[in-house]
Structures are given as structure tokens and as C-alpha cells.
UniProtKB/Swiss-Prot annotation:
PANTHER family: CYTOCHROME C6, CHLOROPLASTIC (PTHR34688:SF2). This is Cytochrome c6. Keywords: Chloroplast, Electron transport, Heme, Iron, Metal-binding, Photosynthesis, Plastid, Signal, Thylakoid, Transport. The lineage of its organism: Eukaryota, Rhodophyta, Bangiophyceae, Bangiales, Bangiaceae. It comes from the Eukaryota. It is found in: Plastid, Chloroplast thylakoid lumen. InterPro entries: Cyt_c-like_dom (IPR009056), Cyt_c-like_dom_sf (IPR036909), Cyt_C6 (IPR023655), Cyt_C_IC (IPR008168). Monomer. Residues 1-25 form the signal peptide. One of its GO terms (cellular component) is chloroplast thylakoid lumen. Functions as an electron carrier between membrane-bound cytochrome b6-f and photosystem I in oxygenic photosynthesis. SUPFAM superfamilies: Cytochrome c. Heme c binds at residues 39, 42-43, 83. It comes from Porphyra purpurea.
């Protein structure tokens, strides 16, 4: 009985991990589309056309405590300084997907 439960649990875990990775990849694809349509005008290539020292590069995100999904989604939703708020214009899922895309690109070096 224990062995059967162990095998079932292991199989279930692999299924969950597999589905999560597929969903995450799809989220990055959507995030890229959302970013291209809404963010790239100011942040093309991870740069910042308005405030050149506030790029989306990994080291700058870390230095400004913006290297997490919550921090990025909060700023995108609410805006800050010259950055407009996108809450109300974009659904939460699109904002989160764009945040995941930004973090993914920052890890790759844009």
C-alpha cells in the first residue's frame, strides 16, 4: 500500500511540475506580447528612455528592490513618477505575465 501511494504521489508530482512549466512558458509568451505592446516604447531592450539610470537590467532591478514579481506588478499597476499606471488598462494576469517576462529577460541580459 505504501509503495502504491508513493508511486502515485511521484507520478502526480511529475504531472504538476510538467503542467506548471508549460503554463509558465505560455505566460512568458504572453508577457512578451504585453511588454511589446505596452512597455517597449520606453523600455525597449531593457532600457529606459525617460530615466536612463532606471533600466530593467538585473543589477539595476536588484539595486532598486524591483527584482521580484510583486514589486514589478505593483509598480506597473500603480505607476510611479513618470511611469503611468496600467491597472485598469491591463488585466492582472497580463501584468503578472509581463513582470515574469521582464525578470526572465533581465536574467538573460536582455
Amino acid at each position: 500500500m505504501k509503495k502504491t501511494l508513493s508511486v502515485l504521489f511521484t507520478a502526480f508530482s511529475f504531472c504538476v511540475i510538467g503542467f506548471t512549466q508549460v503554463a509558465f512558458a505560455a505566460d512568458l509568451d504572453n508577457g512578451e506580447k504585453v511588454f511589446s505592446a505596452n512597455c517597449a516604447a520606453c523600455h525597449a531592450g531593457g532600457n529606459n528612455a525617460i530615466m536612463p539610470d532606471k533600466t530593467l537590467k538585473k543589477d539595476v532591478l536588484e539595486a532598486n528592490s524591483m527584482n521580484g514579481i510583486d514589486a514589478i506588478t505593483y509598480q506597473v499597476t500603480n505607476g510611479k513618477n513618470a511611469m503611468p499606471a496600467f491597472g485598469g488598462r491591463l488585466v492582472d494576469e497580463d501584468i503578472e505575465d509581463a513582470a515574469n517576462y521582464v525578470l526572465s529577460q533581465s536574467e538573460k541580459g536582455w
